[in-house]
Amino acid sequence: MGNGETLSIFPHLAGTFHYFFNHVYARRPFRYPEAVIDTCLGVFDRQDYPLGAQVGFAEIDWVFCLTRSLQQSGHRFGACRAALASFAARYVPFLSGLDASNQAFDDLHQLFGAMCCLAELQQAAPGLIRTEQPLKLVLDRRPFI
């Protein structure tokens, strides 16, 4: 790099998500869930990636890695809950504030990622996201994105 820029670990975390949802579907444990939690919290705290500012998959990548690692280890539970609450407080208003004509809604794949993120948040942190009916966690039924 040489120009003072630093590389983010986030792309690697996002790639890991694709392995993790298959591990969950196969009911297999993650390796090193505590390290994944530390990485997720670090990405969030350092703002390594603009989470909660787009309709897409980055958000589900981060939320899923954090929540499912937390289910397996309980490591830094309070910090995880605080990060999820902070993220939801930013992400839900962002999505709610988008105009229906926004191009983000034209891409069904990206919209699916956003909906998966909301469903994961709703399950992992009850009360953060309220809907008339619970959102369905598609990744628990079919591990494919």
Question: How does the language model describe each region?
Answer:
Residues 1-7, 54-57:
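Short intrinsically disordered, low-complexity coil segments enriched in acidic
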Residues 3-11, 26, 35:
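Active-site loop segments of alpha/beta catalytic cores
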Residues 5-9, 40-50:
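Solenoid-like repeat scaffolds
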Residues 16, 22-44, 54-145:
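Terminal, non-catalytic domain-edge segments
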